[in-house]
Amino acid sequence: MNPRQAEVERNTLETQIRVTLNLDGSGQADLHTGLPFLDHMIHQIVRHGLFDMHIQAQGDLDIDAHHTVEDIGIALGQAFARAVGDKAGIQRYGHAYVPLDEALSRVVVDLSGRPGLIFAVEFPRAQVGDFDVDLFHEFFQGFVNHAQVTLHLDTLRGSNTHHIAETLFKACGRALRMAVAPDPRMAGAVPSTKGTLTL
C-alpha cells in the first residue's frame, strides 16, 4: 500500500492552520492549536488511532475559539480524505466503545463518501477550564464534512464532562483506526458494490 500521508494548509482572515497526517504512524503527536484542552483531546485520536499528526494553528482567539476549533476540524478532515485516498483495500467501517471511570461512549464510522454527523452527546457542564465543550460539535462537523465520512458519536453514560469528552475522542481514534486498516481479502478492491466511494 502506498504511503497514506497528507499535508493541508488552510489560510483565512480568521485562522492559519497547517496539518500533516500519516495514517500508518505510531501515535506521535505535535499539536499547537492554541487551545490546550483541544490539544489534549486530539492527542487521544492520534494515540488511539496510531496516527502521526502535526497541527500548527493560529486563530482569532481574542474573539472566540469557534473559528479555530471548526477550521482545525475542516483541515483535519481534508487531510484525512487525501491520506485515505480512493479507499481501495480497507475495512471502511469502524466502531469502538471506550470507558473512562463512570463515562462510556460509542463511536461508529463509515468511510462512505457521504458526510453525516450524529452527535448524541450531552455534557453536564458547559466548559472544561476555559474551553467551551459545545465547540466539539463544530470540530466534528468540520471533520465530517471534509473527510466525507458518516460518524455517529454517542455518550451512553457519564457525569464528568472531561471524562465524557475523552471517551469520545479515544473511541473516535480507535474507530478510525479500524476503518482505515487494510483488509488483505479485499485484494485492493473498493469496499462497495458501487465500485467507488468517492462519487
From Swiss-Prot:
GO CC annotation: cytoplasm
Coiled coil (residue ranges): none
GO function terms (MF aspect): imidazoleglycerol-phosphate dehydratase activity
Pathway assigned to this chain's UniProt record: Amino-acid biosynthesis; L-histidine biosynthesis; L-histidine from 5-phospho-alpha-D-ribose 1-diphosphate: step 6/9
EC number(s) recorded for this UniProt protein: 4.2.1.19
InterPro entries xref list: IGPD_sf, ImidazoleglycerolP_deHydtase, ImidazoleglycerP_deHydtase_CS, Ribosomal_Su5_D2-typ_SF
Alphabetical list of NCBIfam families matching this protein: PRK00951.1-1, PRK00951.1-5, PRK00951.2-1, PRK00951.2-4
UniProt protein name: Imidazoleglycerol-phosphate dehydratase
Species per Swiss-Prot/TrEMBL record: Acidithiobacillus ferrooxidans (strain ATCC 23270 / DSM 14882 / CIP 104768 / NCIMB 8455)
GN (gene name): hisB
